[in-house]
Design a protein with these regions (language model features):
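N-terminal Rossmann-like FAD-binding beta1-loop-alpha1 element of flavoenzymes
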Residues: 6-33
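Conserved Rossmann-like nucleotide-cofactor binding loop
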Residues: 16, 39, 267
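Dinucleotide-binding Rossmann-like beta1-alpha1 core, especially the glycine-rich loop
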Residues: 50-125
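Helical element adjacent to the flavin cofactor pocket in flavoenzyme catalytic cores
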Residues: 191-249
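Conserved flavin/dinucleotide-binding core of flavoenzymes
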Residues: 327-451
Length: 451
């Protein structure tokens, strides 16, 4: 094969692009990955910050569901430390969830709280209709396409209990990147069946970036990985992608290929390939489905574990807070992410709306109020290491996980991968690598290496 010619060019080194590139390189396709930054991994990379190893986006990863399988298929080892314990903080108290039946237990807690409250104030005892909710839940999981309302409206059919609504809003916001009053119920139910709640998750002991480099290494065995080399154009000839222009140093290089896989996001892909090459129908779908969401990522450093105080490995979901909906004590799970004698905790903060630009100053203020209230030892033993607001126009802002874009584009031989191409019910890095696997399979079936 000629220099400057590859079977596949992958634009961007997120986990979707890395997965597709590694699978194809392993299958004999000469592959080039171009990354505009100096760091591999996208939102699955690792940032060195004041001696700490912090994730650039994704914190906990799912075991299986495409990630583990991809590493196995390319001959690399995926190293992950599982987190066996899950807690919910409800009404100021921490409840540990069983390995199975977490939803049932959560509704039982809500029922008991409602009964106890009614006993205190007198009057008719009214529980939160837990069994009725679970029955409707099972039915809706089996037929999610029939649910046309928001998840909050679906739940209101069975209860107006505020605590129950807070719990489900926390789940929707943390996992699906949308409040229960924003997200369609049809996008929520498939997640429970496909991803099994929050139990099969863990942290990579050496940081996500370390694991992403393993996939990049596979690509290098049958191709190249260029960092600090942004793609400036996707070359389209007669409706077909035939390569890319890449800025490498002070010059622009043309690279020819059979296939172009873009992990740059659909909007950037359209910009690189030229909007005139995309149908109005595709552009309409993109405008409707591609909705970057705002979020605040917070990291707290401390001299001792702030939660759990015994330093055990766990994840906590929080209901009824101002903004913080989940906490992960990273160094209790993966000690290497903090310097010796230090600890670091991650907190995910959900803005009031995932659909519009957030007021960054106000969201940071509310997040800090939550952190100082939720972590009593923070003022004495810790400090807020970093709070990063990512608004809808931030370079690393993800799209919501409601309804994904197709991998195929109107341009032949051009495919999109990443968290905007999520299958229904699969979110985050798991959904992104799933898109990479699907793209790799399309290439395997339609193109021959070295052709």
């Amino acid at each position: 094969m000629q220099p400057g010619k590859y079977d596949v060019v992958v634009i961007g080194s997120g986990i979707g692009g890395l997965g597709a590139g590694a699978l194809l390189a392993k299958r004999g396709y000469r592959t080039l990955m171009v990354e505009q930054t100096s760091r591999i991994g996208g939102r699955c990379a690792t940032e060195e910050y004041q001696g700490f190893k912090l994730p650039t986006g994704a914190v906990a990863l799912h075991k299986g569901l495409g990630i583990t399988e991809t590493y196995q298929e390319v001959g690399a080892e995926f190293d992950i430390t599982m987190v066996p314990r899950l807690f919910y903080r409800i009404g100021g108290k921490d409840y540990e969830m069983p390995s199975k039946g977490s939803l049932t237990m959560l509704l039982e807690i809500v029922n008991k709280m409602e009964v106890d409250r009614t006993k205190l104030v007198g009057g008719l005892i009214k529980a939160a209709a837990g069994e009725k909710i679970m029955g409707a839940f099972r039915k809706s999981i089996a037929e999610p396409e029939k649910q046309t309302m928001t998840f909050r409206d679906w739940l209101l059919q069975y209860t107006d209990n505020e605590v129950a609504h807070d719990i489900f809003d926390t789940i929707c916001a943390t996992i699906e990147c949308g409040h229960s009053y924003e997200i369609p119920a049809a996008a929520v139910f498939p997640w429970f069946t496909k991803m099994g709640g929050l139990r099969e998750v863990g942290l990579t002991p050496h940081g996500n970036g370390f694991e992403m480099e393993k996939l990049a290494k596979v690509i290098r065995t049958n191709g190249d990985v260029w960092t600090d080399c942004p793609a400036t154009k996707i070359v389209v000839e007669k409706g077909k992608a035939s390569g890319v222009l890449v800025r490498k140093g002070d010059s622009e290089t043309k690279v020819s290929s059979q296939v172009v896989i873009s992990n740059a996001g659909p909007r950037k892909t359209v910009e690189l390939a030229g909007a005139n090459n995309f149908s109005e129908d595709y552009m309409r779908i993109m405008r409707l489905r591609l909705r970057p969401h705002p979020v605040v990522l917070a990291f707290v450093a401390s001299d001792r574990p702030l939660w759990p105080e015994d330093g055990s490995a766990a994840i906590m979901m929080l209901a009824g807070t101002r903004r913080v909906t989940s906490i992960i004590p990273m160094s209790s799970i993966a000690p290497e992410c903090a310097p010796p004698g230090q600890h670091v905790l991650f907190a995910y903060a959900s803005p009031k709306s995932y659909c519009v630009r957030m007021n960054e100053e106000e969201e940071l203020r509310q997040t800090e109020l939550d952190l100082r209230e939720l972590l009593p030892g923070l003022n004495k033993y810790g400090r807020i290491l970093k709070m990063e607001p990512r608004n809808i126009d931030h370079d690393d802002t993800a799209t919501n996980a409601w309804f994904g874009m197709p991998i195929e584009t109107p341009v032949k031989n051009l495919y999109n991968v990443g968290d905007a191409m999520l299958p229904l019910g699969v979110v985050g890095a798991t959904g992104a690598i799933d898109s990479g696997r699907r793209a790799a399979e399309i290439v395997r079936k339609g193109f021959k290496p070295g052709a």
